[in-house]
């Protein structure tokens, strides 16, 4: 897999191994140095050394060899199925449930569960680690997720994701009381330059990201909101709400305030998903039941 980067003037004179370490968050600096030694990283079509300092307009091509993965096995893990036919499966993903395997984490994921449930009826466009997976939600975010059962459906849904035509509505509880009852956050999101596993508002290397929000209910110190996505960037709602000083309750990455409640990650639920069905070519929409912990917060805990 190749990645191409053009160096911005603001980032010149940084060592290339550090520069790429900030951009390729899934890989260590040591691994990047290994790629450099093996001539898998070229600057302006030429090999380089790890201590090379990048210059404005440098074209950097990073060729990451395909890793060798362990076998991914089907596992009999219960699924909360919202809808299923020959083309798609809609599941309500619970908290603390990783969508797909990754190096060092090959079991106990949604992929293991759908491989058991669907047998061989899954798209294979995304390879052995992500059969059937056309999009994903964070480990501690609950709610509706589309699984594609064949390659045609996968491509059909992917096109709608690219066109931003899929309806994706979330509900979430944020810190503080919002002054505006509805609004739009339009701010590009990219990798944090220092904290590699985090995202941030990034005007230089970020990708376009748009979130609509609407207040559903206000509490003394919190607000229940509905969010609708135009784009689907990693951690989009979490980053956007933190950027306006209303991070999600329980978010252990973007909310730096101590949570007074025992929560397992952010209070965020993918409530609604709608799309043009690959077979019928008609619009369909599905809702994922709100988890009990979320309902308890709204009805009994928050005042």
PLM feature segments, named:
Residues 1-31, 79, 194, 203-210, ...:
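Pseudouridine synthases involved in rRNA/tRNA modification
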Residues 43-44, 100-101, 148, 199-200, ...:
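Thr-Gly-centered strand-to-loop micro-motif
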Residues 1-184, 188, 293-298:
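RNA pseudouridine synthases
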Residues 114, 199-202:
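Secretory N-termini
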Residues 89, 225-228:
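Short, well-ordered beta-strand segments enriched in hydrophobic/aromatic residues
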Residues 85, 139-140, 166, 207, ...:
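Short flexible coil/turn linkers enriched for glycine and charged/polar residues
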